Swiss-Prot record:
Organism, scientific name: Gallus gallus
GO CC terms: DNA replication factor A complex; nucleoplasm; nucleus; PML body
Protein name: Replication protein A 70 kDa DNA-binding subunit
A GO biological-process term: DNA replication
Function summary: As part of the heterotrimeric replication protein A complex (RPA/RP-A), binds and stabilizes single-stranded DNA intermediates, that form during DNA replication or upon DNA stress. It prevents their reannealing and in parallel, recruits and activates different proteins and complexes involved in DNA metabolism. Thereby, it plays an essential role both in DNA replication and the cellular response to DNA damage.
Length: 614
């Protein structure tokens, strides 16, 4: 494939002309230090006539350099770029999107004899047509460029096209000056004067803080336009000024503000930077911007959450398989009562996750018709497997108008509602109606190496008790309500608890029963603590402690009668190391009678799946 450079394109760009997908050659790339932020790359490029070092790579294109796809002498087509003016009048060209047409080894060196472009004087463009020579409606490029023996694509449509009608290209600021509107994607800390036209997709409440350095207030918003999204925060006087002015889902012109590297720990917004309002910031309503999108999502599959790090901020979409009633809890930090509701979401991966709604979101939620729920900015928790918490900065959309939602609804109505879904969340204290846990056979749990990662794993199984180890199955514990530490018999009628640093005239019995459970394929040693052990043995720890002292034979019979009973077990497995020896420790979190109706349904569903595989 023969490719020609867009001769004269650099001069046209720097003189403010519209250039359509110019073909340029990379002469050199250089990393620029940005402190704690992602690296920025400055690119020296050539159009065959001139070279220019004022090209900057947008951070989303960094992998092209880091993977050595964009290197010295390669030829690329610039699909989208933004020209920014600096305080000193110099121009910087931000490369937003490009395709590498020829790699460096295919080219072998510099094309032509280009000379540096001098921004202070116009350059001759001997072979470049003028902007007026461009067609009014340039053909869309499909990426399959075939230009052998023909002129390379030159100019001549706006470098920043939008398929829908766009907002005005400039706006008057409160000071009366005209300010050019730029896309969110072009914002960077090197700019001092800018205006964006964006929709407010999330607005938080005003929050206050107080510490040794003083006190203050703030609120944050999330903004979106056709090029991307960004988070903005107003502090103190700016918070008082802008909070009553800015409304959710409305469109505004935002002019001036400080741009800094975004703290990704607190936001899922896909932007390397965030805005802080300052004394020069202005916010002007825009009445003609119906083309702007609403909330932007970057959905993660529910099955992928199992491998997502704790505290990550993610976007998810799922069918509300079931939901729980609202409960009230008291937040320790503020001693304030808040509402809480768990909803259980599933997607086409067949996995189910528990998401917790808080406050007003929990109160007003209605999942009775199994709606599609999209959550932007949920935090991943590892409490009992994987679960999600909806934050004050999160956005919850019920039945969103999006292709993902339509696809999910169609899948659920046609087949998804009949599937047996496996939960990646372990909901303590029982589960909501219709919610199934992560059912496994003991063989599956071992073959899938559950518990051998950095985090504990959870699964449920149906197992039969085939052995109980009655030796050391109970111990004398501290009688305090919140302490289960083993006490030391002082041999004087008193029992000492090292944890509480007190002596007591009595103690309580606590159980730690080791049992072997088996199914048709494998077996597993499982540790059962107080409630689980008492359920299996059918007696309380207090009764068993007294029985052991008074009637050893009756004590033995309790264990014999507990053998060969079948239960549903909810099990936590984790690799633990003791005395330099590593082994899987399995702990029963819950033990209950088998629900044979549900168990039969699971077996039938499993048989059908295996039959289809065969």
């Amino acid at each position: 494939m023969s490719v020609r450079l867009s001769e004269g394109a650099i001069a046209a760009i720097m003189q403010g002309e519209n250039v359509y997908k110019p073909v340029l050659q990379v002469i050199n790339t250089r990393a620029i230090a940005t402190g704690n932020g992602p690296p920025r790359y400055r690119v020296l490029m050539s159009d065959g006539v001139n070279t220019l070092s004022s090209f900057m790579l947008a951070t989303q294109l960094n992998p092209l350099v880091e993977e050595e796809r964009l290197s010295a002498h390669c030829i690329c087509q610039v699909n989208r770029f933004i020209v920014n003016s600096l305080k000193d009048g110099r121009r910087v060209v931000i490369l937003m999107d490009l395709d590498v047409l020829k790699t460096a080894d295919m080219v072998g060196g510099t094309v032509g004899n280009p000379v540096p472009y001098n921004e202070g004087q116009g350059q001759q463009r001997s072979s470049a047509p003028t902007a007026n020579a461009a067609p009014n409606k340039p053909q869309q490029q499909d990426g399959n460029l075939s230009v052998a023996g023909s002129a390379a694509p030159k100019y001549h449509a706006p470098s920043n096209q939008f398929s829908k009608a766009s907002a005005p290209s400039s706006v008057k600021t409160p000071g009366g000056t005209q300010s050019k509107v730029v896309p969110i994607a072009s914002l960077n800390p090197y700019q001092s004067k800018w205006t964006i036209c964006a929709r407010v997709t999330q607005k938080g409440q005003i929050r206050t803080w107080s510490n040794s350095r003083g006190e203050g207030k703030l609120f944050s918003i999330e903004l979106v336009d056709e090029s991307g999204e960004i988070r903005a925060t107003a502090f103190n006087d700016q918070a008082d000024k802008f909070f009553p002015l800015i409304e959710l889902n409305k469109v505004y012109y935002f002019t001036k503000g400080n741009l800094k590297t975004a703290n990704k720990q607190y936001t899922a917004v896909k932007n390397d930077y965030e805005i802080t309002f300052n004394n020069e910031t202005s916010v002007v309503p825009c009445d003609d911007a119906q083309h702007l999108p609403s909330v932007q999502f970057d959905f993660v599959s529910i099955s992928d959450l199992e491998n997502t790090p704790k505290d990550s901020i993610v976007d998810v979409i799922g069918i509300c398989k079931s939901y729980e009633d609202v409960t009230k809890i008291v937040v320790k930090a503020s001693n304030r009562e808040v509402s809480k509701r768990n909803v259980h979401l599933m997607d086409t991966s067949g996995k189910l996750v528990t998401a917790t709604l808080w406050g007003n979101e929990a109160e007003k939620f209605d999942g009775s018709r199994q709606p599609v729920i999209a959550i932007k900015g949920a935090r991943v928790s590892d409490f009992g497997g994987r679960s999600l918490s909806v934050l004050s900065s999160s956005t919850v959309v019920v039945n969103p108008d999006s292709p993902e939602a339509f696809k999910l609804r169609g899948w659920f109505d046609s087949e998804g509602q009949l599937l047996e879904c496996a939960s990646i969340s372990d909901v303590r204290g029982g589960s909501a109606s219709g919610v199934n846990t992560n059912w496994k056979t003991l063989y599956e749990a071992k073959s899938e190496r559950l518990g051998q990662g950095d985090k504990a794993d959870y699964f449920s199984c149906v197992g039969t008790i085939v052995h109980l180890r009655k030796e050391n199955c109970m111990y004398q514990a501290c009688p305090s309500q919140d302490c289960n530490k083993k006490v030391i018999d002082q041999q004087n009628g008193l029992y000492r608890c090292e944890k509480c640093d007190r002596e007591f005239p009595n103690f309580k019995y606590r159980m730690m029963l080791l049992v072997t459970i088996a199914d048709s394929l494998d077996y597993q040693w499982v540790t059962c603590f107080q409630e689980s052990a008492e359920f299996i043995l059918g007696q309380s720890a207090t009764f068993l402690g007294e029985l052991k002292d008074k009637n050893e034979q009756a004590f033995e019979e309790v264990f014999q009668n507990a053998n060969f009973n079948t239960y549903e077990f909810k099990i936590r497995v984790k690799l633990e190391t003791y005395n330099d020896e590593s082994r899987i420790k399995a702990t029963a979190l819950d033990v209950k009678p088998v629900n044979y109706r549900e168990y039969s349904k699971r077996l039938i569903a499993s048989i059908r799946r295996n039959a289809q595989l065969g």
